[in-house]
């Protein structure tokens, strides 16, 4: 008995270590551990190639938290790591090193064969990624240029590196270096947007004044850039007043997607005064972007009830639909808080609207995440009490069970039982929820649960396939040796 307990304790300890890899904790790297410390962590069972849920692996965590060069080199050489490994947002180590301004590491990664033209999931090369996030060290740029990247290369929409980095280049030292490489402060992108416009996103009035003194022309696009702000900060009211009242830009300017300043700032923190300023300057909250979204639709996708109320008071029709047939209530159900959902309904938002992708129930199911299960339940209760027929099939015959099984979450399916949905309903392809679950299941839990609430395993799809037939083609079940005999 003692032996069994001891073995179980060892297994539990190993499991917990696997779940809490110390090298995936940013605080570990902030202590700047040397190679000996890292080796010690590896010896304890911490995997140097492991990644967290966001796909930040140990190496990218080390780079982003300023670990020393030798330690990072050691980690890159560990099994499972390489300079071509993709991490968070499809970025490779060269992306992170460039953004961090780690010149020695950038040179090392270039020497090791990193792809300098490799784009991440957002379409950014390593140098463009670094420039866009404010890296202004000329040595980083010089390393890429020395390795073959052309200084005058055009990126997305004709942007140059100078345009991307200008807003963070407070003393224009990087700009001075880049102009020596053939770039110019007079460069514009494919839409005619200038260095002034790009710099406006950082909201540095002194820099903007300096650029004007150097002959850089502002355009109305500067306001749109300013309203987007940066990843780390929002533009303040003083900057907007400077752009509108001194530079004389039009407050009702629109971006390339038809959006106004309000579309961009509505979900940022502490914007009430700025929102009122633009409304007073004539910006109409009812203006829609190219997808048909008005400002209320954007605002409703947050938990900021005050902002929703502020915009709703100026919105002509709370039931305006966008190109997908969605109203502001759809956004609230999918992304907003239960309080926002309730408020919109109280203000007359219709609950019986059907968008191209389904009714409010479908949108709610699509938004489900285990960590937000309580909010999900609240919103499910709100819409069910306000006229949404959650048991009715969608236009293609699918029910919420069909949608729900794709989440592979037992708790979600259990929350749907009280809705009295027909678990054996077949869609236009004659597929039941059990059929769909058989295709996407990662284990047998969901499949067995559906059977327990009455799913019929003998029903067939339009191609004469049973749930067993479909499950037998599920590679995940096969690879994990999950028995599906219970579906026969």
Regions found by a protein language model. Give the residues of each.
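Ankyrin-repeat boundary/"N-cap" motif
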Residues: 20-29, 50-63, 85-95, 119-131, ...
